[in-house]
Curated annotation (Swiss-Prot):
It comes from Oleidesulfovibrio alaskensis (strain ATCC BAA-1058 / DSM 17464 / G20) (Desulfovibrio alaskensis). Binds 1 [4Fe-4S] cluster per subunit. Catalyzes the isomerization between 2-isopropylmalate and 3-isopropylmalate, via the formation of 2-isopropylmaleate. [4Fe-4S] cluster binds at residues 299, 359, 362. Heterodimer of LeuC and LeuD. This is 3-isopropylmalate dehydratase large subunit. HAMAP family: LeuC_type2. It comes from the Bacteria.
Amino acid sequence: MAHTLAQKILQKHTDQQVGEAGQIVRCRVSMALANDITAPLAIKSFRAMGAGKVFDKDRVALVMDHFTPQKDIDSAIQVKNTREFAAQMGITHYYEGGEAGVEHALLPELGLVGPGDIVVGADSHTCTYGGLGAFATGLGSTDVAGAMALGETWFKVPPSIRVSYRGTMPAHVGAKDLVLQLIGHIGVDGALYKALEFDGPVVDAMSVEGRMTIANMAIEAGGKCGLFPSDDLTLAYTAARGRNDEKLSADQDAVYERSLSFDVSDLAPQIACPHLPENVRPVTEVQGVQIHQAVIGSCTNGRISDLREAAAVLRGRKVHKSVRCIVLPATPGIWKQALREGLIETFMDAGCIVGPATCGPCLGGHMGILADGERAIATTNRNFRGRMGSLESEVYLSNPSVAAASAVAGEIADPRGL
């Protein structure tokens, strides 16, 4: 039978014959991942099941990124326990301190994930790696513990929704706007346990970093994963990171549960308003809403292309006196690249706070918590009530250009009007 991209990747990792959606298959995993919040839970389950070693010390990654640099005693204990486990197991890919970064930016940068891989992570945004053509999905810590021990896990073959993009991308519109538009269209449960498979001329021309931004937010529509075909751009990206991958795409006659098509030519920058990522409106309908904080970073939009986009808006301008603009490059490598390109100086000159490679405020962890009545605009991926601090605060999601323009204006602003 013809296979979707999701089915094709699952088939590569199982001895069963992958059939229609709903089938249960056992698959070998290419990488198992956890972070400083979820690893301690996985380690507890790992020990409870009596596992004595990880299945492959080179195919388990533990990244300390959420509450790091350690924000309090409890987070320090979590990191310490994870560090000791990694040493005991001889895990190669343990990252902390100056080697660590936001996990879903760090692993692609290091060449640890790529096309055709199956990646399971104890973090819901593991789906980011679908931008490289990997079947990547978040699992609970107990299931990740099993994958760490056995090197395999089970999946229910997901049905796939095909999402095609055509047209010409307007100025100040990027990948974030495309995925926000999609979530606004289908809702936060519109792809529940389904694979979102992206294609079309816009995708063909899109950078790998842009693809990862879209794949990152597949989970915000309930998706099991978000998948892009691996092409010349993908292979160039992974080859530069020491990999030797092959192109992979869905069969021409693959059967999809549903097909969607969007013309992006007239798309305006999109804003997800409180308190759901599906509450999406064009910036023209939201501009003028006062903000107190702007966050530029995260596993969604903390890569070098995102920082360039924000810096282009901030260059020669000043952050509004009533706004805290927090910039968090997602990895040390991205930080250094931004430094070399003069972006860090641009941010500092504008009055931004430039911090380390951490998830920080995205999950209300630290380095930018909101008080009662405060509003933030952020390039992050979730805006649930209380996500960035107080239950009485609000978070608006946007692309980096909009976040930067809003930081300057002191209110949600359209960068096309600056």
